Curated annotation (Swiss-Prot):
It comes from Sordaria araneosa (Pleurage araneosa). This is GDP-mannose 4,6-dehydratase sdnI. Residues 366-406 are annotated as: Disordered. Residues 368-381, 389-404 have a biased composition (Polar residues). SUPFAM superfamilies: NAD(P)-binding Rossmann-fold domains. The gene is sdnI.
Length: 544
């Protein structure tokens, strides 16, 4: 067990704990005997899981990187030896649409966290890890890129990370922090979000393998990346903070592959060979033997500025602490595709709550093995009730439906009819609304949740969100953009297909919508390269 002065276990604080990297880092730290604290944003998809006992050794705290006061409150109330700063707005394409938000979270968020640690006098005791990116190098850097390669970022995301990199190094030099920047090249896994291109590829290949899709679209097939496995990289991250002094390290495989290579490797897992024809925007991938077009290029998915040749060298990390990647591209892609095939078969491909790794599945007799610190305004278990707005409906004292099969912590079913209107006075720039649709529960009712950030308060004059959802059938996969119908005001009614047409397993889908300053709806695709300005008005759904 990792201990401090043989008196207590080591303790770590992780921002971004519910993301891909956070999940693997938690696995590593718990195995080494750490006590783990994590920062989570109080959204509905997390609240549902926080109603369950967590794995031993994990304590979660509500907050985000834009709130210095909450960070101060959390870090002054716990004893921590290592801080792993993983939280970020990490979509490159999204950063072109939201540069201010991206810099607020990534750049200023890092400064807020470092300044809180400095004010608390922890600069000599706490070791700090900052997760930066190979996107720092831009598109002109010679390959391979190392810690000494000049940085020339070409996206708002990369610019925000350059500030994060520089301010971390500055606090190391100016205030004596044991602080390290991890310049991590692309790293993927089955836990990668479905909005990233690699996971988009593996989920679509899985759907094709299961007969639920015919083809899909991608952007620049020529873009080259150095892809590794998140588990390998998080082991390297932990090793960085065990060194006598803080420094900056590149973690990379040293092998470059194109998006086209990744596609071929994914189809190879399901026994399909892809043959390419055409060039640039006219290029397509065809299945050898059947002639079916499986991949098309859509220029809408191109980034405004593309880093086409990122290739890293981890020579410094190998020399300093012996780090080397264990996964090859082929073994990484195989693990991802096989995992996604299982998710398709289980009906959970588009689950918005991929947090099973947090839950203690061995907990019995109601024993609580976790702690969740939250403010009164963000209580785990809050749910939306059409009759009286928001109320607490947690494991104890929750309002139950007539059907006792509704699990504890599950949000209450949608009543016969719920009308959701755009919120009044939405600030310019939009407001995200995330909807969890859990299909039919055992009572045969649709379950709906709203994100905590969209919870009505005393200043609201309406409820957020404009969306209608269709029930999935045995022949209709739950694909987010296929199931969204939007208008200025839409009613949601429970779907009424016979039980035989609904898959027995739970199905979920994440439907993200933006309402702009004029109350119009912006469609957000479940892919990284959406167009944020596109306004849509689709027909009102026909209710059963």
């Amino acid at each position: 067990m990792a201990t401090v002065d043989s008196q207590r276990p080591k303790s770590a604080f992780i921002t971004g704990i519910t993301g891909q990297d956070g999940s693997y880092l938690v696995d590593i730290l718990l195995e080494k005997g750490y006590q783990v604290h994590g920062l989570v944003r109080p959204s509905s998809q997390r609240r549902q899981f926080l109603s369950h006992p967590l794995r031993r050794g994990i304590t979660l705290h509500y907050g985000d990187m834009t709130d210095s006061a909450t960070l101060m409150q959390i870090l002054s109330s716990i004893t921590v030896d290592e801080v792993y700063h993983l939280a970020a707005q990490s979509h490159v394409a999204v950063s072109f649409q939201t540069p201010l938000l991206t810099c607020d979270i990534n750049a200023l968020g890092t400064l807020r966290l470092l300044e809180v640690l400095r004010i608390l006098g922890l600069e000599k005791r706490v070791r700090f890890y900052s997760a930066v990116t190979s996107e720092l190098f831009g598109n002109e850097a010679p390959a391979p890129q190392t810690e000494e390669t000049p940085m020339a970022p070409v996206s708002p995301y990369a610019v925000s990370k350059l500030f994060q990199y520089a301010i971390t190094a500055n606090f190391r030099e100016a205030y004596g922090f044991h602080a390290s920047n991890g310049i991590l090249f692309n790293h993927e896994s089955p836990r990668r979000g479905t909005t990233f291109v690699t996971r988009k590829i593996t989920t679509q290949v899985a759907l094709i393998a299961c007969g639920l899709s015919e083809s899909f679209e991608l952007g620049n097939l020529n873009a080259t990346r150095d892809w590794g496995h998140a588990q390998d990289y998080m082991e390297g991250v932990w090793m960085m903070l065990q060194q006598p002094e803080g420094s900056d390290y590149v973690l990379a495989t040293g092998q470059a592959s194109s998006v086209r290579d990744f596609v071929e490797a994914a189809f190879k897992v399901i026994g399909t060979k892809i043959e390419w024809s055409g060039e640039n925007e006219s290029e397509m991938g065809t299945e050898v033997g059947t002639g079916k077009v499986r991949v098309r290029v859509n220029p809408e998915y191109y980034r405004p500025v593309e880093n086409e040749n990122l290739l890293g060298s981890a020579v410094k990390a190998k020399a300093a602490f012996g780090w080397e990647p264990k996964y090859t591209l082929e073994s990484l892609v195989e693990e991802m595709v096989l995992s996604d095939i299982e998710l398709v078969k289980s009906g959970k491909m588009f689950s918005t709550t991929n947090l099973d790794w947090l839950i203690d599945r061995s907990a019995e007799d109601g024993e609580t093995t976790s702690a969740v610190n939250s403010s009164p305004s963000s209580t785990a278990g809050d749910t939306y009730k059409a009759s009286d707005g928001w109320s607490t409906s947690g494991a104890e004292g929750s309002e139950q439906t007539e059907c006792s099969s509704v699990a504890e912590g599950t949000d209450i079913p949608v009543p016969e009819k719920v009308e959701l209107l755009p919120s009044a006075g939405v600030e310019e720039g939009g407001h995200d609304v995330a909807i969890d649709v859990l299909g039919k529960d055992d009572c045969g009712k649709v379950v709906l949740t709203l994100d905590e950030q969209d919870k009505p308060n005393e200043n609201d004059e309406g409820h957020l969100a404009v969306v209608a959802v269709e029930e999935a059938t045995a022949t209709t996969p739950f694909v987010g953009t296929d199931l969204i119908k939007m208008d200025s005001s839409i009613s949601i009614e429970p779907a009424t297909p016979s039980p035989s047409t609904v898959a027995e397993s739970e199905r979920r889908v994440n439907l993200t919508i933006t309402i702009d300053g004029e109350g119009r709806v912006t469609k957000v695709y479940n892919v990284p390269d959406f167009t944020a300005e596109e306004k849509v008005t689709l027909p009102t759904p026909v209710t059963a």
